[in-house]
C-alpha cells in the first residue's frame, strides 16, 4: 500500500488542467510548429535545435523524480525533517534547503510535483499549518532554479548557444541564485511568521526509503548535469532506463508515467516555443527593443512576456538572436 505522501504526490500540477485545455495547447503547438516549418524551414530548424534540449532534459528529470518518489526518497526527506526538527523555524530552513537542492539538481518541475505534497504532509503531521511549507516550496522551487542550467528550462533556452557546463554556470550564478533563495525564504517566513513559529513535542513515525534504482538515478543525473555541457540526452537516457525497469517489473503503469510527464503540455509548449523562436529570427523587433532597455527594463519586459505567453515560448522569442549587449 502506498503511503499518503506517495499517493498525494501523484496529483501533479498538470493533473488539474482540464483535458480540453491540455489538448488545445497541444494542438496549438503542433499547428504553430507546422506553420513555422512551412514558412521558414531554416529558421524553424534553428529554433527547434535551440529549444529541444530543455524539453528532453525535463522529461528525463521527471522520470527520474518519479522513480525516486516510488522509492520513497522524497517522503523520507520530509519524515526525517519532521522527526529531527521540532523547532518551527529550523523546520522551515530545512525545507528551504531541500527545495533548493532538489530544484538545482532535478529541475523546478520535479521539485514542485513531488516535494509539495511531501512538505504539506510534513506540516500536518506536526499539527501545524501547511501554508509556510506549501508557499515556500512553490516559491523556493522557482528561486532555486538559477543554480544550474537544468534547474530551469529557461536557462537552457536563453544560454543554450553558449554550451556552458553546469560547473561553469554555477561559478557565475551561485551568488545571485543564493540571494534569490534566501530572500524568498525570508519573505515567506515573515509573512507566515505565526505558522513558522509552531513547535511540536511528538515526532511522526519514521519512514524508510528504498535505497536502490531511484537513488542511483538521482546521483547519476546530478553528475551529468554538473559535468556535461549538453546533458539532455544522457539524463533522458537515465530516466528512460530507470522507468523502463519499473515498467518491466510491473511496478508502474505506462498511463501513469504519461500523466506525470504531461506529454500534451510538453508538446504544446515546444511547438509554441519553436514558432515564436522562428518569429524572433525573422523579426528583429524584440532584439532591438531589448538593446534599448537597461537591466530593470529588460527584467520587466521579460516578465510581462512570460506572463502573456509562458516563460518558455517567451525565452525562445527573446533569445532567438544574440543580444546586442549582455
Where are these regions (language model features)?
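Hydrophobic mid-bilayer segments of alpha-helices in multi-pass membrane transport proteins
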Residues: 4-10, 14-39, 51-63, 211-220, ...
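Interfacial loop-to-helix junctions that mark the boundaries of transmembrane helices
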Residues: 13-22, 43-54, 164-176, 203-208, ...
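Membrane-interfacial helix-loop connectors
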Residues: 42, 103-105, 109, 113-136, ...
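Hydrophobic alpha-helical transmembrane segments
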Residues: 55-56, 89-97, 111, 134-135, ...
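Helix-loop-helix module between adjacent transmembrane segments
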Residues: 65, 98-107, 140-146, 176-184
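Transmembrane helical segments that form the transport core of multi-pass membrane transport proteins
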Residues: 66, 78, 218-321
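C-terminal ends of transmembrane helices
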Residues: 66-80, 120-125, 187-199, 244-257
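Juxtamembrane and boundary regions of transmembrane helices in multi-pass small-molecule transporters
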Residues: 128, 167-209, 213
